[in-house]
Swiss-Prot record:
One cellular component term from this protein's GO annotations in UniProt: mitochondrion
Annotated signal sequence range: none
Protein known as: Altered inheritance of mitochondria protein 23, mitochondrial
InterPro entries: AIM23 (IPR029427)
Family to which this protein belongs: Belongs to the AIM23 family.
Predominant location category: mitochondrion
Lineage, opening ranks: Eukaryota, Fungi, Dikarya, Ascomycota, Saccharomycotina
GO biological process: mitochondrial translational initiation
One Pfam family named in its UniProt record: mIF3
GO MF: mitochondrial ribosome binding
Coiled coil location: none
Intrachain disulfide bonds: none
Compartments where found: Mitochondrion
Amino acid sequence: MIRSILCCRPVRQFHSSFLSLNSASPALNAGIAIDAWLKRGTAKSNIKNRKKYDHHHNGENRRRKKPMAVRWSSGTERAKEAANHMLSKVFETNSKGNIRFFNQISGKVEDSNIREFAKGIDLSQHGINIVNIINTETEQLPFVKLVDTKTALKKYSDYLAEKKEEELKSMGLLPRKFFENSKTNEDNLKHIKISWSIKEDDLAKQKAHDITSMLKKGNKVNLYIADKEDLGGSKWMENFENVEEEKPPSKKRLRPSEIERRESIIEQLKLLVSDISTDPIIEGRANGKMIIRLTPKVNKDDSIDKRSLKELKKQQRIEKLNKKLQRKKERELQDD
């Protein structure tokens, strides 16, 4: 039995295993050595085969998960980076690249694939943004929206800034003042809820006071206008995430008089902030939900007055210096 096994294996490899055993019982030791050598050979072959299997199947997984590249033919390098960043976010959410978007031509929310959606996008005019994540029964779908290039680049710059901040924070290179300033910038945006059912007296007094006082302090203000049920709860802001694409419920048709009243509220708000805010950015519809974004207006007269005062002081210093020089010359002439 031992002889037949030895004939099937290289003698040199077996000999080293055999000699390492105790020579007290040659037959027993020979059997143990052969058994150990066979097991070792089997383990090596198993590891080798396992590596081949893992390499083959991991390669398949990598090929399967690799998203199809989109070649951009327009836009700056920065715009392309911003678009590719959004593509990667889409594939992180949905490995197949499936998305949901609002079709402005049909006026409907439709499902598609990011590869198809990205075709023909002019990055010099538009960019891509993910405004929400939709959970279906089978998968998660990023809700994608076309935005202007400026907005897309701003969002990408914010992402890079946050990423850099996290890196510096982890390295302990950011001073405390930086965090305080960041918190101040976040607190600079104020949110005010307004119900469509608000009374004119409340709008003209309490809400008007809240809005104007915040703008005068230099705060940006977002006005969220909707029915009361959309303004309640701790997560009420989620109701305004897709306010541009959202269509009002077909069952809920408002009377013309109600539409007119709501439009009157909007006009009152615009008139209220006309002197202290830049042109409001209005999103949504009067028969649904709306967001009015307000930015405090920089008082040009104040800045002009400050510059004038600075120039006046500078001129006064020059005149004072000239007088000193003149007096010095006069004294020198008198001494001569």
